[in-house]
Amino acid sequence: WPGLLETMVRNLRRQEDRIRIFESGRVFSSQNGMSVERTCIGGAILGLAFAGQWDGARTGVDFFDLKGDVEALLSYGEIAHSSRWRSTENVAALHPGESAEILLQNKPIGLAGKLHPELADYYGLEQPVYLFELDLEEALARKIPHYKSVSRFPALSRDLSVVVSDEITASQ
């Protein structure tokens, strides 16, 4: 997440008040003394939940905005309905009371939560930042939607047929 956080800081310095960013790439880690490589997607949100409301409301993002974004992403693989979220407190970069593990068939495929206050201070972030990371290989190993060709016929904006008796006049 360091790259995402640095990008957020850069955008905040340019007076952006609503930031939603993501990146994808390979992540390397060590498990049982072996080097493991995974393809992941990570994202971060900060600032206003909605751009320019007519009533002037300025509601900030929260955990549920992040959860909605992650579930929308999972819906492309048609697995959002089968994913579960479980509270977790053992991720050093995330706030212990506002973090979750994302599970698919009881197997962890990602993490999501609020940036830990100490890290927020380190980066100089005064607003709450919410982050997620998904293992793309695990998420995409599930059902992938298939392409459907576009219809040859244009969409109709309206189509109305009314059948009436010949005895009825237009004025009736």
Which residues does each predicted region cover?
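Extended beta-strand-rich architecture
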Residues: W1-Q172
